[in-house]
């Protein structure tokens, strides 16, 4: 018998793709950065250190002073 895991993601909110873009009169512009490795959209994190992170390949760019 094969067990199928339960989907517990019903309570979590999903990312809305339309919030990633800024629409002007004749152009559409991406708000976030794109990953230089894989090309997916990167997330901007503020804590514990400010950084840009890719959830797909794990590439991370740290912003600000180094310790």
From Swiss-Prot:
Coiled coil: none annotated. This is Small ribosomal subunit protein eS31. Part of the 30S ribosomal subunit. One of its GO terms (molecular function) is zinc ion binding. Its cofactor is Zn(2+). Binds 1 zinc ion per subunit. A zinc finger (C4-type) spans 35-57. Zn(2+) binds at residues 35, 38, 54, 57. It comes from Sulfolobus acidocaldarius (strain ATCC 33909 / DSM 639 / JCM 8929 / NBRC 15157 / NCIMB 11770). SUPFAM superfamilies: Zn-binding ribosomal proteins (SSF57829). Keywords: Metal-binding, Ribonucleoprotein, Ribosomal protein, Zinc, Zinc-finger. The gene is rps27ae. One of its GO terms (cellular component) is ribonucleoprotein complex. One of its GO terms (biological process) is translation. Belongs to the eukaryotic ribosomal protein eS31 family. The keyword Membrane does not apply. It holds the Pfam family Ribosomal_S27.
């Amino acid at each position: 018998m094969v067990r199928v895991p339960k989907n517990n993601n019903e309570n979590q909110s999903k990312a809305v793709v339309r919030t990633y873009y800024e629409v002007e009169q004749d152009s559409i512009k991406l708000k976030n950065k794109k990953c230089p490795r894989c090309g997916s959209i990167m997330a901007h994190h503020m804590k514990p250190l400010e950084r840009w992170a890719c959830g797909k390949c794990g590439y991370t760019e740290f912003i600000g002073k180094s310790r």
